[in-house]
Amino acid sequence: MSLRFIVGRAGSGKSHSCLEEVRQRLRQNQGESSIILLVPEQATFQYEYMLATTPELKGMIWAQVLSFRRLAFRVLQEMGGAARAHIDDLGKKMVLRRILEQRKSELKVFHRAAKQPGFADSLASALSELKLYRIEPQELQKGIQHMQEAPGSAIRDKLADLSLLYNDLEEFLSGRFTDPDDYLNLLAQRLPGSRTVQGAEIFIDGFTGFTPQEYGVIEQMLGTADRVHVALCFDPMYLQEPCDELEFFYPTVETYHTLLDMAGALRISLEPPIICGKETPVRFQKDSAIAHLEKYYFRHPLQASDAAQGVSLVACANRRAEVEAAAREIIRLCREEELSWRDIVVVLRDLTNYSDLINTIFNDHGIPVFIDEKRNVLHHPLVELIRSALEVITQHWAYDPVFRYLKTDLIPVQRDDVDRLENYVLAHGIRGNRWNDNRDWTYRRQYTLGEDCDIDDNEAEQLAQLNVVRYAAIEHINNFSKKVANCGNVRQITTALFELLESLSVAERMEAWAKEAEVAGRLIEAKEHAQIWDNVILLLDEIVEAMGEQELNLEEYLQVLEAGLESLKLGLIPPGLDQVVVGTLERSRNPNVKAALVLGISDGVLPARPVEEGLFSDYEREALREIGLNLAPGARRKLFDEQYLIYTALTRASSRLWLSYPQADDEGKALMPSPVIQRVKELLPLIQEEILPVEPPCLGGDLAFIANPSRSLSYLAAMLRETVAGRLVDPVWQDVYSWFVQQPQYQESCRRVLAGLYHVNQETSLPPSMGRRLYGSRLRASVSRLERFTTCPFSHFLSHGLKLKERSQFKLAAPDLGQFFHAALKLFAERIKALSLDWGQLSRGQIITITGEIVEELAPQLQNEILLSTARHRYLIKKLRRTLERAVVTLAEHARRGSFRPVAVEIGFGDNAELPAVQLDLADHCQMEMAGRIDRIDSACEGGQHYYSLIDYKSGQPDIKLADIVHGLKLQLLTYLDVALRYSKQLTQQEALPAAMLYFSVRDPFVASTGPMTEEEAEKNLLKQLKMKGLLLADPLVISKMDKELSGQSDLLPVGLKKNGDFYSNSRVITEEQFKLLRNYLEFKLKSIGQQMVSGDIAISPYQRGKEKACRYCIFKSVCQFDPLLEDNLFRLLADQEEQVLWSLIKESLGDKHE
């Protein structure tokens, strides 16, 4: 039995020496003894690979590459102890939650923290640390006794709490479970009797230091194995000289002395150490720059070198540019220096901000990559299935969990069917027991409250298919819901969950997905699918083992399960042999690489800022160390350990070292380089730092950007854009373009790039024949449709030509409220007519009663009872009642002060309507039929002549200007007035003249006041706020029929009358001749718009008038992609002109017709 050290600085050949000796033993070994190569967990694959690929080595059956944990499994399988169920971190946390609940009243320090979420996690970590450092509850009690002289000591009370909880945990685990944190203690106990270790030769490599548990195992090895070889990285000078705590080699020198003392205590013979390396370590014989960094980085005073080759310093615009640059460098190394992918590693201090970027960008560059990190599985379909299935029940079949469940692709329903089902559910607000009440869905979207509810054959067939999909979609989750309803404890719920997974054949689906991914070459994804099922089942088993008989409701069970799923991570080994490995400095173990790219060398990242973690502060750790309770190093020691990580980063590769840092983060905030960068500059002053942008510069471009065809193509597109813009571009991009054009596989991509360069974001007109096919030679149109066309022809094409529309959702929107008020006001007019009541004589009480009845009648009809669906919507009914009441009170005041009375309410014109359609002849034998519905037509008689006042209800605060009519933006009022006058004989048996066209705002406004206000004053203020807007006939007698109390400015109408009978200048009045002129212009404008439609005008041409833009509320922005910065995307500017100019334009447009 002997111990031998293999010592040397980085790159001196320690690992090579270990491997060579193992190979030599394998060549000589005839089975007399086993050979164990003990390395860190993450390095086992690399060492196995290096042994397995040794030329002329016939086999390695007598050699095993193991980590401490794998050695423990091997020995416990041999000696007993491996069969007992083990409990992992999640199980311990669940047990500790229960213990904390039971003991919270007895805790001195943790009694408040015990209730906080996450405390069980911190406690579990603290107890694991105690076990790793071989501190038993008895040692904690001794520590408490040492501190008895310090009354009220927080550390003493903390130890007391930990001792109590530690004891409870051990009592719970005893005889039931094996704690993985105890594996190495068990290994140390069983190891002396193990034939695996007895007489074996053990090589230990790759460690900086060991935990007390690991020291305990090594202690037993020294007394059991034949020979133990330990490779440690430090300068051989420290074999004879003391090492200061501030030295970066201190951790490994401390390890050396600990093992030396251990061997002395055990009286194990020491073999002479093997000292590796010469003046220049073997690894760096070919690269003096890296060798200089290895030797002098931590030495003072500074010793600069004129060496430069082999080390690169790179500053990049941001992290994306940094990873892009790293990808280009890797391709260059493989292409120009003939390295293999496996010869290159990428290392970082922290992968958090880089992992996704590296995965995406390296794949874009065609670089095979393996990122050495535990993979979170929260977004895996299986995990999402489990979480959403439970949430479906806990959230009572809410929309979100139901469709997360259905979109996992683990349900026997096609995704297209799920999408159709989702559209239907969103449109009709289906949730809760409407999913599983066994009644077919027959809900339909109604666009008016009086719509016929009969379902045609096509709709019936679609609903039948939808219900088939629905029943198939909920079959398994419905059964699961019924089972869970009868479950009383954790075991029963978990059993029901497992049966759900079985019924869905999830295990078979995972296997099929794994095979599919493997065939497609997605090896990482294949391994994830292959591992996830077993890991989830193990998690369910552990939950049952730890809490099986505990009674939890489903919400509490879900919390426990989610905690387990969040901690579930997959550890994968590299799926291929030749690939770039990416890892952190702490985990990365690649002993034989030629090039290392160290990314993210920013201030505060490398070295990392120390952070106090766990239940013990640095001060408390030091205090415990003084009484013999040694815990893990605190933040201060970790800061010194960071120096060793810097050393490993700089010495990882043998020939190429590429150091980079980002100058800004993802939000553009500046980042400073690490002091490491400055130190390297000082040691190697001849190295020129490169500053790399996100994209290549136009002139003097770096050829490294032309490294990968797919990425070069995107850069080429940028360069061609610069050329088109008239800027000079490096001629090399012409060569790049020529290369792409000559490659058959890239010709289509080149075509798209060129098309994009000269892309004009504009649509050419449809051929007239296509326009007629699309809209018909007999164009049926509404005024709102024509106004949409005037707003933007392309918007009209999308909505009425292609019939695009927003996804229908079960929510109360402005159109729904408009629909409600139109129906309510119609019903009110019909109700008072049936009761023979006059609008002008209605009392407030009558108004309140009738409006209340109407709201109660209509509320259930709106959108499948949406107003009854939630408390918020039920409150809205009260608001709607108030608004309707206010509208009727205002209209009644109009009637009281005037003579105009309704002659038609909600009257339609068009096919199958009360009034005929308006027929307009267009060119090329086309016709346009105008159809619509008029809210209200009032009539009064003056001097034997009937006059019509046209009223349109709006929910906002609308107004109309002459410019709106001239530009065709607001034609509805004028069109409806024209229809009313056109068919006046059918309404009042004689022709009528226009009196007004007005907007009436249906709303319940607030009254602003700076002081007390009487009810009469408030009513007057409300009338002013609800004053109608529009145009009236400039005839005082006719206007007096609308407001007989008019004196000065009217509070009902947009008009004011002076004492001399003249109108105020702000009065919105026009003459009878002007009304006639507007009606003639209307016909001209309608025909003009209709002709543009059928002619195929679909131009992207939104209007802009001042700050008002057509695109502001357009739902088609993502389709048209209108961009004012593009040369061909210009707003159609509409100028604000004086009314005199506008009347001239109208006359000019009509020519002789206005005479």
From Swiss-Prot:
[4Fe-4S] cluster binds at residues 792, 1111, 1114, 1120. Keywords: 4Fe-4S, ATP-binding, DNA damage, DNA repair, DNA-binding, Exonuclease, Helicase, Hydrolase, Iron, Iron-sulfur, Metal-binding, Nuclease, Nucleotide-binding. ATP binds at residues 8-15. Its EC number is 3.1.-.-. The keyword ATP-binding applies. It holds the Pfam family PDDEXK_1. InterPro entries: ADDB_N (IPR049035), DNA_helicase_suAddB (IPR014140), DNA_helicase_UvrD-like_C (IPR014017), P-loop_NTPase (IPR027417), PDDEXK-like_dom_sf (IPR011604), PDDEXK_AddAB-type (IPR038726). Heterodimer of AddA and AddB. Despite having conserved helicase domains, this subunit does not have helicase activity. This is ATP-dependent helicase/deoxyribonuclease subunit B. The lineage of its organism: Bacteria, Bacillati, Bacillota, Clostridia, Eubacteriales. The gene is addB.
